[in-house]
């Protein structure tokens, strides 16, 4: 699947959210949109622009392109419950996201690379599809030849236990994690309003 190849830092500044550790540091120094008039842009933002911005936040945060994001939305609509909540839950179940949440990678982008390069298994079987949706009880583990990679060990050492969510059980020493449950919406702390995305797609 094609991936975004532009500047994540510029996108982060435009959307006002940190999409990577590097972007987070950059935003601390330059917390405004890129470009000559980034600091002085003012004026009322239209409802459509707000909805579009929230969709962009979700897409870039989870590393999902438009066609797949729309597919998640259609699936969320078909499920019982609140569509926006369902959408967030689907994105949180992605393999690359759970790898990131487990502390095995410093960003979702880095987690995606670990997955696509075949470093991880699910229930003992190699899975290299970032969009694979985990179900409760599934075990994520590094393949034997991939254990103790420097980047992974460094990320685990830097990841405080408080950052690892309650719906994932992580064994740092053995570099494995169990996806315990699908998180409730209120357990997912991300800077977006998915209801605006639902309104956008509902038009």
Swiss-Prot record:
UniProt cross-references to Gene3D superfamilies, sorted A to Z: Ribosomal Protein S4 Delta 41, Chain A, domain 1, RNA-binding S4 domain
GO CC annotation: small ribosomal subunit
InterPro entries: Ribosomal_uS4, Ribosomal_uS4_bac-type, Ribosomal_uS4_N, S4_RNA-bd, S4_RNA-bd_sf
Gene Ontology biological-process entries: ribosomal small subunit biogenesis; translation
Keywords: Ribonucleoprotein, Ribosomal protein, RNA-binding, rRNA-binding
A Pfam family of this chain: Ribosomal_S4
Domain S4 RNA-binding: 93-173
GO molecular function: rRNA binding; structural constituent of ribosome
SUPFAM superfamilies: Alpha-L RNA-binding motif
NCBIfam families: PRK05327.1, rpsD_bact
Assembly, per entry: Part of the 30S ribosomal subunit. Contacts protein S5. The interaction surface between S4 and S5 is involved in control of translational fidelity.
Family: Belongs to the universal ribosomal protein uS4 family.
Function: One of the primary rRNA binding proteins, it binds directly to 16S rRNA where it nucleates assembly of the body of the 30S subunit.
Record's protein name: Small ribosomal subunit protein uS4
Protein source organism: Chlorobium phaeobacteroides (strain DSM 266 / SMG 266 / 2430)
Gene transcribed to yield this protein: rpsD
């Amino acid at each position: 699947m094609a991936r975004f190849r532009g500047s994540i830092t510029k996108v982060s500044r435009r959307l006002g959210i940190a999409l990577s550790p590097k972007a987070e540091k950059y935003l601390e120094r330059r917390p405004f949109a890129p470009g000559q008039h980034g600091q002085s842009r003012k004026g009322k933002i239209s409802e459509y622009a707000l909805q579009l911005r929230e969709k962009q936040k979700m897409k870039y945060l989870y590393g999902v392109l438009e066609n797949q994001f729309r597919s998640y939305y259609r699936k969320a609509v078909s499920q019982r419950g609140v569509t926006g909540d369902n959408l967030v839950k689907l994105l949180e179940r992605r393999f690359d996201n759970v790898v990131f949440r487990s502390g095995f990678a410093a960003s979702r982008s880095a987690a995606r690379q670990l997955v696509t390069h075949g470093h991880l298994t699910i229930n003992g079987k190699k899975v290299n599809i970032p969009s694979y949706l985990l179900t409760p009880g599934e075990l994520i583990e590094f393949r034997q030849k991939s254990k103790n990679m420097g980047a992974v060990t460094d990320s685990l050492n830097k990841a405080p236990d408080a950052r690892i969510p309650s719906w994932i059980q992580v064994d740092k020493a053995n570099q494995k994690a169990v996806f315990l449950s699908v998180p409730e919406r209120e357990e997912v702390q991300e800077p977006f309003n998915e209801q605006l995305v639902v309104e956008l797609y509902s038009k």
